[in-house]
């Protein structure tokens, strides 16, 4: 449970960095508290999407992973970010990713920042 909480906090931080760096990834809302709560909920959705959907997509696209020497991971991460944006829209959350290439850059940013944060945050075993 602690591990899931740590990963959710890391994902929320990574998503915040992506929102900050890319104009086409938007997080609208009133106060800072509302935006923080929205980021945490979006991070939960992102974590669930990565936990449930991503392994299935990785198995189905395994030949493309082999052919591209792993670069197809960027496309899969972009699709997971777009799916998170779609789910957030259905849940009336004010998080939106505008376009595939923005999602590719956003997925790259989220992956790097999340990796860095997870390296420094406690494991929570």
Curated annotation (Swiss-Prot):
Keyword Cell membrane included in the entry's annotation: yes
Keyword Cell membrane: yes
Keywords in alphabetical order: Cell membrane, Membrane, Transmembrane, Transmembrane helix
UniProt-annotated location(s): Cell membrane
GO CC annotation terms, alphabetical: plasma membrane
Ranges that cross the membrane: 9-29, 33-53, 56-76, 100-120
Alphabetized InterPro entries for the sequence: Phage_holin_4_2
Record membrane topology: Multi-pass membrane protein
PANTHER family in alphabetical order: SLR0284 PROTEIN
Name by which UniProt lists this protein: Uncharacterized protein SCO3922
Organism (species): Streptomyces coelicolor (strain ATCC BAA-471 / A3(2) / M145)
